Amino acid sequence: MEKIKKFNTQIASHLANNLENSLRELRRCGAHRSSKATFTEMGIQLSGFKNDLAENNKFNALVGNAWIDNEADYYLPAVMTVDVQRQEQEVTTYVLNDHGNNQRVIMYLTGGAYIQRPDKTHWQYLNRLAIATDAKIYVPIYSLVPHDTYRTAYQEIASLYSKIYTLMPASKVTIMGDSAGGGLAAGFCEYLGKKGLPQPGHLILFSPWLDLNLTNPLISKYEDKDVTLAVNGLRKIGTMWAGDTDHQDYRLSPLYGNLDQLRDVTVFVGTREIMYPDVTLFVQKLRDAGIAVNSYTGRGLFHIYPLYQIPEAKGVMKRVVATINN
């Protein structure tokens, strides 16, 4: 009983500090974050994922659970209203909203720190995305740590992408990704450029993980504000994901890759998350390389905020729809 009380006190203290810091930042920048965004951020904090990454015993449990979960058959949460088909090829892939060959296509790479499969929030967002865009959406359940490294995931995604662009012009394809999936999407597009393969018409990223080692010194200023991610835990997962490959390889850290072949990039990031500094740097590098890029910063908002059902995400959805249908 004493242990539970201690835990609850700790969580309450963190929540109070988080709310106080949030209000202070909003007053300073003059933004007006919705109350729903504030309560959503609290819910994310209560989920405990950041603690799972930050604390050694919880991190070990996270990896242990992943050994079991990531080898088990994947079951889709019962939240979808659009048509869903499951394809078993090189990689298990869910195809959403397929009703013809004239649709635009999205290949969406879900985040989860390279250790967790897509969760309910992902599928709720993807359902809304399918309705808003009327696009056909491919969602591969790509391989993750601790069983596999990025090499397996790249093979799976490359196989799926090649099948997609043989069915339609690559210009009608959009690659999207959030968090780790956003880093994977960016690295994969750099890989396409290196291999001389066709780029998608659009690349849309939500809070992408762009440097596997998270070495930017500015990140330390944002870690306390970030209710989702902890640097040390991500670095340990990154080591597993990389295998024997240098962590600055563009497939792992697209921030350091050749950006010249990318086209029409759109990036969203919040100011209360550790990915913010590297996203800012990535956008500047894209502009320096002459790549068309649109960057949107959610002031006072959290990691992958566009995926959540908050008022601030509605404007993001409109921009995503306009980009995909352009």
Q: Can you annotate each of these PLM segments?
A:
Residues E88-Y94, N101-N326:
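Alpha/beta-hydrolase superfamily serine-hydrolase fold, recognizing
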Residues M1-G100:
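A glycine/proline-hinged amphipathic helix-loop "lid/cap" segment
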